[in-house]
């Protein structure tokens, strides 16, 4: 475990220097990272092909392979994402408030970096670049531990970023990667109090549960996305169909994709055959309740477990509900607090849904797929938090900072 400890020591030392960098220095480094990604595309793709070959040989699912895959467009998108982070306002040093006390003390609250951020994530190489860019802009050092299936891709990306940062004289250790796939290394990282300030897991329920239960470092839990769309009796059904197809089919392997569809019983006879046909045309396997199967005969029977499941695939659980009360009760029981949507024309039902559904993002007449840092205007995101402390929802730059109080006096002492 010496490698992990040395990485953490370098990151801790680098974090002190990163906190003092100017916005201009950080932006130059980010632009250099983007340049290196574009100039070394073939090298990245070659390493990614090694990972893909192993994944296919290991019989991993098409959805998993889709998340693992890099191509020219995705690398260009990564580079553009880094440039977008460079364009974002620097949160470090922002003065959040200033007050003068009756005794003359001036008390200010200032935004500062978290310090050293550890990220344990599954096999999505884009997370490697997004996380490094965001942490750098927020003045943090970062230690990355990606999934073993993306090891070659991640190593290529981190090596290029290290070269880019070195050329801009950014401290060594600003971006580090655990260069082993050993679980022991990940477990050791989780216990590095005093070196890591926060640990962020990104991935499926199993990974997140492991980190939350075993880490002694403070954790920001990025959540499982068991997301729902509820179609009310007064909904515009054409709009509902567009939203459902987008939320389920556009990119099913991501956490903001819909996993369960809830339909009001009064529109079920008309809407379920319509949406069932559209979903089938998009290759979706439907698992429905008894009423659902009456109107979509080829739907499979849904189990209790299906309603708890984040499928991350072209599989959808469907349930017919009596009313808004039952829809909210279902979401409360089975939902993961990520993203929930209602399709309705009724303002009061929409308002009640937004007030009573406890989730990081609650939508009225829109797809859950918008729960994303770019779509919210934050730039790239470090993850989507489903907890309430220290952040909730898409975590951008500000969520990678904390605050401290700076107090100016003229010799005051406390009586």
Curated annotation (Swiss-Prot):
Matching NCBIfam families: PRK00197.1, proA
Instruction: Give the Gene Ontology MF terms in alphabetical order.
Output: glutamate-5-semialdehyde dehydrogenase activity; NADP binding
Q: What is this protein called?
A: Gamma-glutamyl phosphate reductase
UniProt keyword terms in alphabetical order: Amino-acid biosynthesis, Cytoplasm, NADP, Oxidoreductase, Proline biosynthesis
HAMAP family recorded: ProA (MF_00412)
For this protein, the Enzyme Commission number is 1.2.1.41
Q: Name one GO cellular component term.
A: cytoplasm
Q: In which pathway does it act?
A: Amino-acid biosynthesis; L-proline biosynthesis; L-glutamate 5-semialdehyde from L-glutamate: step 2/2
Keyword Amino-acid biosynthesis present in the record's keywords: the answer is yes
Q: Please give the biological process terms from Gene Ontology that the record holds.
A: L-proline biosynthetic process
Q: Where in the cell is it found?
A: Cytoplasm
Record keyword Metal-binding present: no
